[in-house]
UniProtKB/Swiss-Prot annotation:
Residue sites binding Mg(2+) per the record: N173, D259, F261, N262
Pfam families assigned to the protein according to its UniProt record, in alphabetical order: Methyltransf_7
Gene3D superfamilies with a match to the protein in the record: Methyltransferase, alpha-helical capping domain, Vaccinia Virus protein VP39
Protein name: Probable caffeine synthase 4
Entry similarity comment: Belongs to the methyltransferase superfamily. Type-7 methyltransferase family.
Cofactor binding note from Swiss-Prot or TrEMBL: Binds 1 Mg(2+) ion per subunit.
Binding site for S-adenosyl-L-homocysteine: Y18, C61, N66, D98, L99, S134, F135
Protein's GO biological process: methylation
Lineage, highest ranks first: Eukaryota, Viridiplantae, Streptophyta, Embryophyta, Tracheophyta
Protein EC: 2.1.1.-
Pathway: Alkaloid biosynthesis
GO molecular function: metal ion binding; methyltransferase activity
Species in which this protein is naturally found: Camellia sinensis (Tea plant)
Top-level EC class: transferase
Amino acid sequence: MEVKEALFMNRGEGESSYAQNSSFTQKVASMTMPVLENAVETLFSKDFHLFQALNAADLGCATSPNTFTVISTIKRMMEKKCRELNCQTLELQVYLNDLPGNDFNTLFKGLLSKVVVGNKCEEVSCYVMGVPGSFHGRLFPRNSLHLVHSCYSAHWLSQAPKGLTSREGLPLNKGKIYISKRSPPVVREAYLSQFHDDFTMFLNARSQEVVPHGCMVLILPSRQSSDPSSMESCFTWELLAIAIAELVSQGLIDEDKLDTFNVPSYFPSLEEVKDIVERDGSFTIDHMEGFELDTLQMQENDKWIRGEKLAKAVRAFTEPIISNQFGHEIMDKLYDKFTHIVASDLEGKIPKSTSIVLVLSKIVG
């Protein structure tokens, strides 16, 4: 499986689309807006307001309304600082990045409806451009970005971890699609190694693109436990693996497809992220904290409704990569099974989700 081709959120604006089922990531983005606001203020304290334009990038933007929130927040803070500093009129250039499979049409349609693109106000003119490509490599010219933002994207891996088959070619993570309590230590080690390599590549590419003293605001799903197989980080993938296994038992999916599939994603701990940033040495950590949120952004006591809501949210960001492996024709059955597992086996009990937000500044010299 080529991750660059298979990884994207559900397209369009329909019932299963990411645009209609991203309330959780919207809440995460909303919770971290004060951090982004402070980052923009800090940029102005470093004399970046002397430039005619501020160049910002939102990496892994998908099609969520989050993008509008990010752009409007940066723009609003620029206007505020312009008034406070009595500086010249500024322009804001925002680059929206995701893999080529992303639904950029729906994204820009949404931005245009909110009068972001081409909207000229008194202090700040805003211009937006799409940049398809992998953020694990270079996307922009050297020293061209003042600010980088990424929300719930940097945990995706460039590929499934290597070394998950034995010398005889047998799958080492049989019956699972991610780290689980049953996974041998080599699986956990392979996932951490792949995340280390990919996040290091991410930092290295950004260190070349971000101007001296420029900054990044990164938000990642994470875990509090040192154990990567803890339920807080494995919940979604564990339930999907159970649902897929049930379809295997019914003869609807080939067992080999389950045994050879490993999700290209990793929920790191705060300590793991900190260690990688410090080892890389391109950025200093200005701010770093973890926080918890209810996975479902709704008050609902009915376990079946909770199951259906969670299944829709999960389907919105997992269906493309899952269907690439197992086929489009069984997707309805798979997510119906997922709903049933949440409602019946778990009685609608859904663990909270943990996130990390960090602000990094590029080291000079």
